[in-house]
Amino acid sequence: MGDLITIERHVLESQKDHPGATGEFTKLLYDVAFAAKLVYRHVVRAGLVDILGSAGSTNVQGEEVKKLDLFANEQFTKAIGHHGRFAVMASEENEDIILPPLDKYGKYVLLFDPLDGSSNIDANVSVGTIFSIFKRKSDAGGPGTLEDCLQKGAEQVASGYVIYGSSVMLVYTTGQGVHGFTLDPSIGEFLLSHENIKTPKRGKIYSMNEGYYRYFDDGIKKYIKYLQQEDKASKRPYSARYIGSCVADFHRNLLYGGIFIYPRTAKSPKGKLRLMYEANPLAFICEQAGGRASNGRERILDIKPTELHQRTPLFIGSEEDVKIAEEFEQGLRDIEHDEALCPKSLTSE
């Protein structure tokens, strides 16, 4: 058996490249991993302990809250908020920012989606937790502020996700590559299983909810037709794979290559996914793995948020696939002759 590397050891060893490190960041990530174990313990027992189904309420997004959503949100808030490592937190499930219960405020900011894909819980489909970590901008010593949370994704110091499937895997980046850890339930530790993950430059999978086809812009409709055309040179047609759990679809495409798209629609002109809780953390991971992420026109990590629960379209995955999708979205490409068109501003008069 090879050397067993826990997530705590992995982060500690990476601290050698940062002489000013105090160890707080390592403990912080370990807190996240611990909270994920608590959630997993209940995810696998959900049908036995009466936490499946609806809680009879809606969250700030206007979505029906599942019982396990509430449990996961509570576990992350409690497990992480009581150690004084954070100045402020924000959850997809809470309307306002969350301040630590103690008078000790740390230097980090945590934003998280406690249970992504929760609409699939009752069907026993993979769900996950997504998190994003920033350094506070406000003065140290006091509570964090809303402005601490409204930072560009490019300012993240770490992001990651945990996927609860046939096995439990935690994937994270601190801007020095992407690493995956699989939970060994016999010892209760996340062990390094996927070191320095790199996503293929181009894949053969596209993931999107084509049930909304009638609401898509013409550029996206053309892109779908492009993916379905047969062309051996570009390895088309692509295979459609859509789970309906963003983190699960992203995880598969990260490993095998491909693109996940949740575009703007006539029903959701600003997009559907949350910039702070889903798009930013996944975009950071994707870029660190060699991929690309945008809203179809602008790099996700360059978007300056103006509100806590801001939504955005999302094009994320293999670099070449995302670039082609962006060209269709921007009207720079057409399936009629399958080639990039000159921008309208450059067209000869």
Swiss-Prot record:
Molecular function GO terms recorded: fructose 1,6-bisphosphate 1-phosphatase activity; magnesium ion binding
Binding site residues for Mg(2+) 2: 113, 116, 278
GO cellular component entries: cytosol
Catalytic activity: beta-D-fructose 1,6-bisphosphate + H2O = beta-D-fructose 6-phosphate + phosphate
Name of protein: Fructose-1,6-bisphosphatase class 1
Record lineage: Bacteria, Pseudomonadati, Chlorobiota, Chlorobiia, Chlorobiales
Keywords tagged on the record: Calvin cycle, Carbohydrate metabolism, Cytoplasm, Hydrolase, Magnesium, Metal-binding
Magnesium found in the keyword field: yes
Co-factor(s): Mg(2+)
Major subcellular location class: cytoplasm
Family named by the database record: Belongs to the FBPase class 1 family.
GO biological process annotation, one example: sucrose biosynthetic process
Matches recorded under InterPro entries: FBPase_C_dom (IPR044015), FBPase_class-1 (IPR000146), FBPase_N (IPR033391), FBPtase (IPR028343)
Binding sites annotated in the UniProt record for substrate: 116-119, 209, 242, 272
Protein localization: Cytoplasm
Source domain of life: Bacteria
Pathway: Carbohydrate biosynthesis; Calvin cycle
Organism expressing this protein natively: Chloroherpeton thalassium (strain ATCC 35110 / GB-78)
Known partners and oligomeric status: Homotetramer.
Ligand binding (Mg(2+) 1): 92, 113, 115
Its EC number(s): 3.1.3.11
Top-level class of the enzyme under EC nomenclature: hydrolase
Cofactor comment: Binds 2 magnesium ions per subunit.
